[in-house]
Amino acid sequence: MSDSDDYLQDDPDDQAFDDFADVASSPPPPKRRRLQARNQTRNTTSRRNEDNSVASDSDSFVVDDDDASKTDELPSPSQASYHFADHPENEASSKYKIFVPKRNNPQENIFVTQLTQPPSPPEMIRGPRWKKPDPPPPPPPAPTKPTPKTTRGPGHEDYGDDEDLDAAIAASLASFEEENSRLSFSTAQNSPPAPVASDNAPTNTAQTESFDFLDDIPDDAFDSDLSLTPPPPAPPSNSSRPSSFMQSSNRPLGVRQTTLFNMATRNQAPQPPQGEQVFAPPEKVEAPTQHKLNQEAISTWVYPTNLGKTRDYQFNITQKGLFHNLLVALPTGLGKTFIAATIMLNWFRWTRDAQIVFVAPTKPLVAQQVSACFGVAGIPRSQTTMLTGEAAPGIRAQEWQDKRVFFMTPQTLINDLKSGIADPKRIVLLVVDEAHRATGGYAYVEVVKFLRRYNQSFRVLALTATPGSTVESVQAVIDGLEISKVEIRTEQSLDIREYVHARNTEVQTFKNSEEMVLCMDLLSKTLQPLVDQLRTLNAYWGRDPMALTAYGLTKSRQQWMLSDAGRNSSFGLKGKVNAIFTVLASLAHGIDLLKYHGITPFYRHLLHFQGNTDGQKGGKYQRQIVQDEHFKKLMNHLSPWTKNPEFIGHPKLEYLKQVVLNHFMDAGEGSAGAEGASQSTTRVMIFVHFRDSAEEVARVLKRYEPMIRPQVFVGQASAKGSDGMNQKTQLGVVQKFKQGTYNTIVATSIGEEGLDIGEVDLIVCYDSSASPIRMLQRMGRTGRKRAGNIVLLLMEGKEEESYIKAKDNYEKMQQMIASGTRFTFHDDKSPRILPPGVKPIVDKRHIDIPEENEEQALPEPKRRGRVPKKPPKKFHMPDNVITGFTKASSLAGGSKRTAQDKRKARTPTPEPVDIPALEDVILTAEQQRELEHRYCTIGDTSPEVIRTPRTDAFPRLQLVSRPTKVVKHGSLTRRMIDALQKMDKTSSDCEGRFKEVLALESRRPAEESLIHQSISRPGNKKRLRKGRSGQPEPRLPPSRVHEEKDEDLDGSQPISPEQLLSSFTDRQGPKPFSSSPRSENLELDADFEAPDLDTLLGRR
């Protein structure tokens, strides 16, 4: 007997209910009616042939023939209204009231996994819920041949005999496979294969029932990505067994997709590994690029596999960096250089002659990136160069003409762009290292702005470990570099967690030692009088001298100077306040050294402060501090302490010594003696803020050589008492640290950014930094290849609070940057560059490194015997610019007038000026007397008479300009002198010669005579014309003057003598006719007077 039989016979509740149905004439419950309706639609033939077997599925109740008399068969829903009509107790009333609907329609079971509406974000207001109406009932299936079933014993259930459930599952899988085929990542589009039908299931029935069942299942029930809109469901094929599920052709995004029954599908086509994503370049409408592209190479992009296993985050970031202006924020040591080298390699392949530029803020960083790109990307060394400011401009110009890949500092790049040495239109890729510096007016920002003026088709890749500490600083980086997308990873990101080793961070806080408390007490008593004076003047509100800071004093000084008291105070009071502020600000730095770095740096600072007061140096208040009794007592205490080599002036320094010693002892350092001391297996790096602190830490650790071999690592600038390190020395220290010559580096901020110092097992932060950028740069130096330790040494109070603030700020900023909701990106300035329709496919392969790249020397330009000359400055013209001059009317949108619209204005003929009579011009006798009496005579005790200048006096001196002091000669004076010089050159026989010339011209034919030609032209009687040589043409000979006067009696104006004389000049030049060999040798008498013009022209 099966479990179903036991359920029907042994359940006392069911038997009581059957007895009550017979007595109360009530219909069966709805559950029994639904089960009976489903049983009637099944194939009843197979059930009759099973004598000793029962269908054990959960939706049917079938009993044996022997037990039929014991159990009443349930009526069908269609017979519910008349099944108990002939029962004798049908009319008896019952105390149980059961609602019986008048119309009953058989309904199939509905499996609902999700809502039927399309997916939508949670913040959107949804509309009313709606369910698709039920389809019309299918026609009754045709009877099929019964299939024998295997008889099983009690307790065995066959869950695969429900054809409806199998068909529904097959239909759901068909829809799921159709969705996966549409989202295929492979290039070949293969339609999913049809499912194989089972032999023991009816074909037509399965098709019909599965179709009805699929209508009630939501379209997106099996979608793995809600951002994709599901396609309409395809007609499913027949399937009766879960073992005959269709095979998926793809799996989106490498996620393991399973069915409702926890069964995974298998893919036939090859697909990307788990975690890798495929991105296509964005489709944009833009002008074609000016770069020459390699049409054969742009169909694929190369991903090097030289370094072994492919990292998913590097693959995905590289793919986005090829097609977008990308800001990459990765923790230190996770392969930002590999990403940059891969992107540079692909753009090198895609273009024929375009140039690629990698910029880094310092020269050591530039040299480090060169070696990394040579060994990873395989870019030929012959096409690569490293340019710095040390190279001559002529050499740099030659390199810009011949090479394609450049490694340089941003300052050198902007200088070459502005001078015209570099062509901005040829640059296709700009890689920016340490991109968090690209704010304000830094060289990175200037380079991008300059390139954008001339080039609209270039890509930007920005690399950094921490983009910024505030929203404003991150937005400034995005604006300065025109970033369109951000890829950020933290140490908690899932795709990089396996590549980041554990880092144990230990935070140790300290209190002031007894020596430090004594020093603070004495210094506080020394500075208290000056602080009280500032408080009396309301210039500073603090009371404790140990709370002084340089920044606080500077702000207080500015506020006091801007206040009414500061503006209205006397100059003496202003000088006093400024002097006190200056002295206190100088000692505020020493207070920080005492609190956070140690007594020895503090003592060095006080010695320098005391040395500035020797003799007459230093101000009044500075000498007042040095001569104070508490200051002298303080110096007497500090001097013997610092001279003791065993003295340690800060509790942090004592703890630092113990931590470093324990680390090297645990690692077995120094156990091999002096011979094995140079082969270190572990490294330690200590970060400090000031050089004095670095030297003090190195002094303490050098006591334990050779176990601890420390080396100070500082910047290039020289400071008081400390010389800087040039770049060659810095690189040498780094190389020795990698080799094991030094196993401990005590570095300032120069060791925080960028430099590949190598694998470090222990990081000790001697002082805390309030900047999240500096904090993360420090902590990122360990935990790259193996587990690392970080020890933070903090003083209680301000330093501890600064660390907590920096840590919280970093975590908050990483979340905001990853979300991208607080920032504005520049997608419009991120061009596609590639032609439309081109979608490169990844080509993972091993890159063959050229033999020339194995050379260890940097690719700097070789020194030449003769340095080439700097080329002339070249001005690059932006695209689509308007050359030439443009009128303001055209800029304002006005229409351009053609030449035909312009009408030439007719110039009127000038009328001759009437010559007034001589009597009207010359003063009368009465006017002359009035002039002399009123204007020429000055009445005084000694009358003075002002006379007109005499032109006849000093004739030789009037031919030249006389020297002046204040008032220079006017234009009239210069003209007068010029006229007198010309008159002086006139010879004595000019009258005779003029007559001869005029006589010769008058006897010539009319066609050749210049006089006749000038008179025959129209208008010559009234105005003066000039000849071709620019000289006035002669008018009339003297012999015909009176004849022309007779002809002009009709009212025309006669020619004046001056006009007639001026027409007789030589056409060949300014030399007058008077110039002759005979007249040049004549010497004029002193009393010679030139002839009158009227007399000259009137004589015949």
UniProtKB/Swiss-Prot annotation:
Q: Where is the composition biased (Basic residues)?
A: 863-875, 1019-1028
Which residue ranges does the UniProt annotation give for the motif DEAH box? 433-436
Which keywords label this protein? ATP-binding, DNA damage, DNA repair, DNA-binding, Helicase, Hydrolase, Nucleotide-binding, Nucleus
Q: Name one GO biological process term.
A: interstrand cross-link repair
The top EC class is hydrolase
Sequence intervals crossing the membrane = none
Instruction: Output compositional bias ranges, type Pro residues.
Output: 135-146
Instruction: Describe the family membership recorded for this protein in Swiss-Prot or TrEMBL.
Output: Belongs to the DEAD box helicase family. DEAH subfamily. FANCM sub-subfamily.
Quaternary state and interactors? Interacts with the MHF histone-fold complex to form the FANCM-MHF complex.
What's the protein here called?
Answer: ATP-dependent DNA helicase mph1
